[in-house]
Amino acid sequence: SILQYRDTVQRHFVASMATAETTAEHREKILSDFYLYQQKAIEAGKDDDERTFILPNVRDRAATHRLATLMAEHGVEVKQASESFRACGERYKAGAFIIDTAQPRGLFAKTTFTQQVDMDKTFVAEQERRRANKLRDQIYDVTGWSLPLMFNVDTESCDDAVKVKGEMISADMPLQSEMVNADAKVAYLVPWGDMSAGRFLTAALRAGIQVKSADQAFKMESGSYPAGTLIVEVAQNDKTLAEKISRIATETGARVVGVDTSWVVEGPSFGSENTAGMSAPKIAIAWDEPTSSLSAGSLRFVIERQFNYPVTAIRTGNMSWANLSDYQVIILPSGNYARHLGTGGAENLKDWVSKGGVLITIANATQWAASENVGLLDVKREYALKDDDVTAQDDSDVIEGTTIENREGFLNAIENEQELPDYVAGILTRVEVDQEHWLTAGVNPEVVAMVTGNDIYSPIKLGSGK
């Protein structure tokens, strides 16, 4: 029989009502179990080797603040220290966040903060057996999920309770800005390297403020500033600049340092060729089929909600003929674009890129851009690297016979000459960052990234990019 849309709605309604009725009938048992679960969490936390998690809140204030308030949003008790303190032999400054796992939500905190949770050895052995037999693994989702690692936030643990004065934070606690010399005579500097600086930049550009970015690190009497630091010169903006800077700093939580001199002790000066002017780009994103809703939705959420910057959604099919000259950046989320864009779409995007457009491709979209028919990227997708030479397939109708002595020999005989690498089911991996590239301005030398899939590309040649 044909399943109608109304049938799915009805069944969803029936299932929801049945769940609600069952919960109501057994409410005492459910509430009792929930209470005991939280009580168990308190006792487990007291004896845990990682009883307390500490977020020093020294590097990347914005990410640390976001992680702390996210935990508070999920009911975790998070304290912010109001004074410096010592814990397990280490000293921490005021402002550090503390999570004691001896609390009702302690098991949740433990699960999301523990950096290494080994999979069951028997399960791992079974997956390796399946892989050796050319079968897919049974891993349902990602294998790494430590929130501090995913946020690239420094976190330390202590096997004891931490006694320090402080206050429990709320989910809506704002990130406090740091404003030095609000009435600067020459310029305002915003050190690059966290989300608050990024939000400051988007807000400043939307407010019509003239902003520069330093391609290299530099030093002044007021301190050292990393590559990517934003420079807002007083002389290049109107008389309301100080008021705008103060307002944007408060809204974004950014750290802003006003300076009364342009004298640079070391590094490029404000007027050198190593300080580039920033412009407010118009951004478009491919929408609807064939884009992945998860990929497109998450990208748009980050730009529009976390950076408060507008994005125009364009139906993918329209990119084959639409005039793209109004946009400086186009994002292609993960998706299979060959059929929907076709030759016309590829040529339209190629022409747009040749005129200075910036094309950003995600996951499967990169496969499309790097394909031979499109050629937007001078890279090739790689096959798996074989440990041993695999005999090429003979296309003759009849071939010489071979002796297969054991199962290993049989598996080798049926192995494809070329096949894609094994699929990675979501791992957290440490990435070494090229500190000489302009895209990495303000980024730490090492970051943690989520890796999933089996796409491996050849390195891009210097003549085509870096």
Regions found by a protein language model. Name each.
Residues S1-K466:
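Intrinsic-disorder/low-complexity accessory segments
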